[in-house]
Amino acid sequence: MQDDALSPPRARRAPPVPAAPAAVAVGAAVLARSAAQTLAEQLAGHYAARIRQRLLLPGARLPSVRESARRHRVSPSTVVAAYDQLLAQGLVEAKRQRGFFVRDGDTMTPRAAGATLAEPPDLAVHRAITTETSPRQSAPLRPPPVDATALIRGMFAADAQHPAPGLGTLPPEWLDAAMLQTALRRVMAPARSASDTHLPSSYLSYGEPAGDTRLRHALAQRLADFGVPATPAQIVTANGATHALDIVSRGLLTPGDAVLVDDPGWSVEFARLTQLGMRLLPVPRGVDGPDLAAMDALAKAHQPRLYVTCSVLHNPTGASLGLASAHQVLRLAEQHDFRILEDDTYAHLAPAHAPRLCALDGLRRTIYVSGFAKILAPGWRVGFMAAPPDLVERLVDVKLLGTLTTPALLEQAVAVCLEQGWLRRHADRVVARLGAARTRSVKLALAAGCRFATPPAGLFGWVDTGVDTERLATDLLDEGWLLAPGTVFHPGRRPSTLMRINFATTQDPRFWRAFEKARGA
């Protein structure tokens, strides 16, 4: 809210608009005309929350006053008052004849009460909106980007009223909470007598450095089903697959190293590797795998240390690596002396016989990473890596320096789910349900005028919309729909008409109606 010292004498309320409802939807929030706050205060709070959650990034331009008034069904004076408050809070800046822009985080500090402004907010608003009524205005509105961080934050700020088409997780109602509760009780029961209700002491101390022994044995059996020859001694657990990927990167790489990545590929991995100081070498990814000629040329020119890839049910395309391509990738890795980090996050949704590089290579030059967030629960941060014997101690050391150990209670509960066959049966049910959802989503997408760039498979569809999906993502975000625009899946963030959809969360006709409306705008 605006500081008292900078507030106008009377709060400005929007005049009645006959056609407007009593409550105005604004994404995940609602503007209520009868609320204690003015509409301007509610609208300012809406944008302030988006900025602080990094759904609107530094440099992003806010909608024009007229566009925001139309979008939120309020008067222009209400929008002016809301932007005035954002200026006073130091969240945005007004640029003469250009509009309002999110300020850089380093300078985004709330104004102290009574602080002196170089330019009064009202005057800054006037200067910023002067061009809106000028016939010379021709520059298009630059949409605030949706990036990897925004997608992650979207997981924690999703609109409860809408499914999130851009997220990479299953809907909560698809998960089996009863199975998880039973597994936890099963783990704790042997340590308790009928009169003992205390938590066993073994769960109050650090766990084993490499991870719970029981889980590592269960994982070794699971990997054997995929043809990956890993002993329990070759497996190290982590706080989720993302943590496992980070451990491997820190253990094998140093800042400045070159890393081959799929293009398109997982946006979070690009951001993480860049943050660690690595040089990304994008390899075009097709239906059957990477462009082998491009990989060969990049390897010759840059001597990469690592290739990070998702062989099965690739994110974002849903495609899986062909057997012939897999053998050629391994040949190039041997020829150019780089290791391969295989991310098998979606293993539970894929056929066991799908070609995996780690199975073909026998864990000699490859490292396998997976987890359980996608199939059990995102909050159960249990992941693991399986590596060649000569790398295991190095990876354990990196884990110890970063997090010490991982929670034994959750690891043993996951082991129970594996040992009892509960996880396999649950995964079979999810795969069947996902197949039906995929069929419905594909029909809706095609009816909305989209086409699939790769054959639909697994959790994700790689959809060509025919228009700039970054603009689509911006427009639909205010309607409460979080999209995953194609640009975030390219290391260079190039413009894209593609978007990733989650088949489990795109069966709602309301989304496709909103999509068609935004695309035609």
Predicted feature descriptions by range:
Residues 1-186, 396, 400-406, 429, ...:
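N-terminal basic, amphipathic alpha-helical segments
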Residues 187-336, 348-363, 367:
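Conserved core of the PLP fold type I
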Residues 366-445, 451-453:
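PLP-dependent aminotransferase class I/II
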Residues 387, 463-467, 503-505:
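Short beta-strand-to-loop capping motifs
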